[in-house]
Amino acid sequence: MYWRHGRHWYVSAGKWVPLPADLSSALAEYANIVTPGRGMSSLIDRAMGEISGRVKPNTLAQYKIAAARLKTVLAEFSPDQVRPKHVAAIKQHFAKTPNMANRILSFLRVVFSYAVEWQEVESNPCIGIRRHVEKKRDRYISDAEFLAVREKAIPHLAAIMDIAYLTGQRIGDVLAIRRADVSEAGIAFCQQKTNKRLIVRMSADLGAAVARAKVLNDNVRGLTLFHTRGGKPYGYYTIRDQFDRACAAAGVENFHLHDLRAKALTDAKRQGLDPQKLGGHQTQAMTDRYIRQREIDMADPPKMGGVLDSVKNAN
């Protein structure tokens, strides 16, 4: 493969075949030319076709990111050329982002499980490769930080933040709220991750937040509570990027979109409510693990009075 005149080229028998200027796309196309239908890019696409209808939307979105990165890293490999040492190298390559590295490893393991089933490889090279240890997040967002970011958020993001906090649900579930899910009784959810069904009871605060959300783009009728000017639901990554910009504008660091759910469940417990029911967790242990990282014990200090009295008596 050669670079000339602003793009990549594949040369075979004296004939120059143009490839995309983008390196990752060029490598993927090069692999398909050299080993048509047998390269890693082809295997990943075929496996993705099998996976797409079997996983949750959030998982599928993560797999698509992993697929794009693996197509670049393994562009010149055929499936039978990938060895455990190559998988270990991929793990190390993405070590600075252990969460993403683990998603990539999980996806690659699934891809090769299909390759084994289709008898394209003898064994799965991902077996025996350990995942990175992911540090448990213990960041608690204070009320002041929440309000500071909300103040810098554009209107629909501010409304999403409010309803995410007041319902304690995952962002994907909040973005999926349909107008038909909202009633005087509350907001009905079917959690995408667990299929757990619950209704978050309507309160004065939640009702006000829903009312604010309904007036956004009210000239366009959409099926979902939150929608674009074209009537389509907002995508997760669109909202995440807008949220990150609001955090930067507010000067609040290390505030992730998912921290809204953690704050909601932690605050609910402190207010004497039922965080397990609000979070849709099957067991109390799941909720305790989720909240415990964000709770800090409050200890009372000793009083100086006794010390001062001792000093006075000694004098």
Give, region by region, the residue ranges found by the protein language model.
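Conserved tyrosine-mediated DNA breakage-rejoining catalytic core shared by Y-recombinases
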Residues: 128, 136, 140, 144-148, ...
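C-terminal catalytic core of tyrosine-transesterase DNA break-rejoin enzymes
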Residues: 99, 117, 159-162, 166, ...
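Short, Arg/Lys-rich segments that mark the N-terminal edge of DNA/RNA- and chromatin-recognition modules
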Residues: 1-19
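Active-site/catalytic core of tyrosine-dependent DNA strand-transfer enzymes
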Residues: 203-252, 264
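C-terminal secondary-structure termini that scaffold catalytic or DNA-interacting sites
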Residues: 212-220, 228-231, 285, 302-315
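Basic, Lys/Arg- and aromatic-enriched nucleic-acid-binding interface segment
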Residues: 102-104, 117, 121-122, 127-171, ...
